[in-house]
């Protein structure tokens, strides 16, 4: 190990946190995670700094804590090491470390409430004689010292977690093999979490987004329940007003979609429940199935959702045929496309410029602004 720096200053030894390695587990390298705090009135100087020895690639930040998750493994199983560093009033506080069985899907697999960390993981590994490989899922509740105080294990055997989201005392997570169980878990008693409902539908959601107070939007893929083959991109709306009886109220299928960055980068999704709008960019393979060479098949879909009518398409835009790109749009350009609205105007923001559309006039294009080269 080396001593890390913040700017030109070496970090003091008592501000470097070294978690105790778990016996018989390996790590994919070790690097420093350095966090600094600055005051707004004097931003060129750090008020405090903390370093953690970690290989973490998943992070979650709550109101008063920073969590990092590192995958560790031995020859039979995978675990996730969690490190917590507290922060309050511009100062970092003592850390804590713990671990759970399995691996996290992404940062939405973690959530803090009432000084407890709730985690969902996919657990897989070999038995003692390496004759059988198994996969299941677990839900764990850790206290402020990151010790497990409650858990549910062996959920959805043979499946893996595809999406998760938490709200208050309820956790929602999707597992998948050939069908899509959406679980709702009661977390009101941290020591005794329980599954309240399990909804089985075809396909699976890759991303969950709370859509107003009592609805949950799922975006992912529709699949054939017999073969598991993808048949289209799916948007599902779930009624979560009663977590013990979650229902899918509507679904919308986009055919022939090959890839969608928004499923893995939530910043790429426009979600505006008050406007009843959501949108995302997606791609369709042409003759060449290399994603980096499909420069003529990028689109933006804008949809609405109302309780009475369900999902309704508002606009499909062929982005790379627009005057901004004129057929020369790259995959990197596509990944940076964003949709926003201001008042009654919808704007498509890209690397090459902005295009505006009037929502009240059936999304009539009203103007284009190209960035100067």
Question: PLM features: what roles do these ranges have?
Answer:
Residues 1-373:
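Beta-sheet-rich non-transmembrane sensory/scaffold domains
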């Amino acid at each position: 190990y080396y001593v890390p720096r913040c700017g030109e200053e070496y970090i003091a030894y008592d501000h470097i946190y070294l978690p105790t390695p778990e016996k018989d587990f390996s790590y994919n390298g070790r690097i420093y995670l350095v966090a600094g705090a600055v005051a707004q009135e004097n931003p060129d100087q750090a008020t405090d700094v903390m370093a953690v020895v970690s290989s973490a690639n998943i992070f979650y930040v709550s109101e008063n804590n920073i969590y990092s998750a590192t995958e560790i493994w031995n020859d039979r199983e995978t675990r996730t090491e969690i490190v917590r560093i507290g922060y309050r009033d511009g100062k970092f506080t003592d850390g804590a470390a713990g671990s759970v069985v399995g691996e996290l899907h992404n940062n939405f697999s973690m959530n803090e409430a009432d000084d407890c960390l709730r985690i969902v993981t996919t657990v897989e590994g070999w038995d003692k004689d390496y004759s059988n490989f198994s996969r299941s899922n677990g839900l764990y509740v850790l206290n402020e010292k990151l010790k497990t105080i409650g858990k549910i294990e062996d959920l959805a055997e043979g499946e893996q977690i595809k999406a998760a989201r938490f709200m208050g005392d309820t956790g929602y997570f999707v597992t998948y093999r050939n069908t899509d169980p959406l679980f709702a878990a009661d977390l009101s008693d941290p020591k005794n979490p329980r599954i309240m409902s399990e909804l089985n539908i075809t396909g699976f959601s890759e991303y969950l987004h709370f859509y107003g107070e009592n609805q949950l939007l799922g975006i992912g893929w529709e699949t054939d329940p017999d073969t598991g083959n993808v048949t289209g991109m799916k948007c599902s709306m779930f009624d979560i007003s009663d977590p013990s009886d979650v229902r899918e109220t509507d679904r919308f299928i986009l055919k022939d979609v090959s890839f969608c960055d928004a499923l893995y980068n939530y910043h790429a999704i426009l979600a505006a429940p008050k406007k009843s709008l959501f949108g995302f960019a997606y791609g369709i393979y042409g003759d060449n199935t290399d994603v980096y060479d499909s420069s003529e098949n990028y689109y933006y879909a804008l949809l609405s959702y109302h309780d009475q009518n369900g999902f309704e398409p508002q606009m499909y835009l062929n982005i790379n045929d627009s005057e901004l790109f004129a057929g020369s749009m790259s995959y990197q350009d596509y990944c940076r496309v964003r949709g926003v609205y201001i008042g009654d105007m919808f704007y498509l923001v890209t690397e090459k410029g902005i295009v505006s559309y009037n929502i009240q006039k059936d999304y009539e294009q009203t103007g284009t602004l190209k960035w100067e080269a």
